[in-house]
Amino acid sequence: PLDMTNISVNYDDKWLYNADRARLHTFVENCRQAMKTGEPGFSFNFGDKQNETLRNACTEVTSEDDSDVCNLGSINMSNIKDIEEFKHVVELGSKFLVCGTLRADLPYEKVYKVREKNRRLGLGLMGIHEWLLKRKAKYEVTPELHKWLEVYRDESKKAADSHCDRLYLSRPVAYRAIAP
């Protein structure tokens, strides 16, 4: 009955701060099973993010708000030559996704209200492996990639917030989402 079903385990503050040794056993057993079958996926949600159980292992999104939507789009890093161009593309991508929250036709009224409240964006990255290969790097976080990821984090929020302010819109509750 669970064939083709994604199973995800949510690790939250209650699990993190549990002094019981069963906590470690649970994690080890989950890892063992995931390495054997690919399930379960893990979701780590701690601190102020502990209620953001917004994804499973495939990054399929479910929100704690009924009828929520997320406007998604990705940047192909392998097509970008330098960090200045990347910064500009992140800015444009973020603004584009904000505009998409204004124009999309939605199925019913509640979705419009939740969208206005959350204005959830998911600016993603793809082509990271090819980007690394072009720089003769392994598939790992290099110092250069770390700088680019900082630009991605900072500029996506800055651009979306400033564009929302300019248009008198609510600011997004989320800005980025990267699929595996």
For each predicted feature, which ranges?
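Glycine-rich ThDP/TPP pyrophosphate-binding loop and its adjacent helix/strand module
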Residues: 1-49
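Internal maturation/activation junctions in enzymes
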Residues: 2-21, 96-112, 116, 127, ...
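A general structural signal for short secondary-structure junctions and capping/turn motifs
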Residues: 25, 31-36, 50, 59-67, ...
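Function-dense linear segments that define catalytic or interfacial modules
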Residues: 34-135
